[in-house]
């Protein structure tokens, strides 16, 4: 079954290594019959922690269509690319999500309501007459 995927790749930050690894990724995608490529480069960024002794990396997002049976084999081949630090492939779902606006309430409203309820309950309890025989 052909599905639409979105993959995020993290490459080493050096220009030559980045371009070579990106070409290798594209080559592997075409080997596994991926089609309808859409690329988006997010550029070079500092990493939160070192990955394979690298402190910076280049991010690339590629959207493509591919048969789901080839996905496992593609992931195995991607792990063999030396200058590819990390990758993540997700199934892209194009559903429109309806966003319902919620009225934002002030914290004081909650506090005031609680105080009022406590007063009402204490007044209710004090007005009750109990006869004891």
UniProtKB/Swiss-Prot annotation:
Transmembrane segments: none annotated. CDD domains: bS6. GO terms for molecular function: rRNA binding; structural constituent of ribosome. The keyword RNA-binding applies. Pfam families: Ribosomal_S6. GO terms for cellular component: ribonucleoprotein complex; ribosome. GO terms for biological process: translation. InterPro entries: Ribosomal_bS6, Ribosomal_bS6_sf, Ribosomal_S6_plastid/chlpt, Transl_elong_EF1B/ribsomal_bS6. Belongs to the bacterial ribosomal protein bS6 family. This is Small ribosomal subunit protein bS6. It comes from Borrelia turicatae (strain 91E135).
